[in-house]
């Protein structure tokens, strides 16, 4: 086997749950930034209250673990590894979608504000001087 085939064998589509020490919104943002830049990540959900991050995609969990430890300086542990086969249950996908919706549709998103709330204020702000208000 060549090195390319070995690398492809280790990388599979999976859901991985990490236990990450997060105590404030800045910690959560830093972790989200590192995970979003990692190659192969499709979606991720951070839960600051339970100190957990669920990552879904074609990733090598050990590489992501090392990257999170190095970039954030936090204690990180792998909690669950689930490989997705052809007969994957849709319950896990639905739970992840519900978690994503609850984070975005709640009072605040994981970054402290919702995008749709900010759009209302940005339409007629002082920074957007070319905004046109036309009342028909």
Swiss-Prot record:
<feature type="binding site">
    <location>
        <position position="24"/>
    </location>
    <ligand>
        <name>a metal cation</name>
    </ligand>
</feature>
<dbReference type="GO" id="GO:0046872">
    <property type="term" value="F:metal ion binding"/>
</dbReference>
<dbReference type="InterPro" id="IPR044577">
    <property type="entry name" value="HIPP4/7/8/17/18/19"/>
</dbReference>
<keyword id="KW-0479">Metal-binding</keyword>
<protein>
    <recommendedName>
        <fullName>Heavy metal-associated isoprenylated plant protein 19</fullName>
    </recommendedName>
</protein>
<dbReference type="InterPro" id="IPR036163">
    <property type="entry name" value="HMA_dom_sf"/>
</dbReference>
<keyword id="KW-0449">Lipoprotein</keyword>
<comment type="similarity">
    <text>Belongs to the HIPP family.</text>
</comment>
<feature type="binding site">
    <location>
        <position position="27"/>
    </location>
    <ligand>
        <name>a metal cation</name>
    </ligand>
</feature>
<dbReference type="Pfam" id="PF00403">
    <property type="entry name" value="HMA"/>
</dbReference>
<dbReference type="InterPro" id="IPR006121">
    <property type="entry name" value="HMA_dom"/>
</dbReference>
<feature type="modified residue" description="Cysteine methyl ester">
    <location>
        <position position="133"/>
    </location>
</feature>
<keyword id="KW-0488">Methylation</keyword>
<comment type="function">
    <text>Heavy-metal-binding protein.</text>
</comment>
<feature type="propeptide" description="Removed in mature form">
    <location>
        <begin position="134"/>
        <end position="136"/>
    </location>
</feature>
<feature type="domain" description="HMA">
    <location>
        <begin position="13"/>
        <end position="77"/>
    </location>
</feature>
<keyword id="KW-0636">Prenylation</keyword>
<feature type="lipid moiety-binding region" description="S-farnesyl cysteine">
    <location>
        <position position="133"/>
    </location>
</feature>
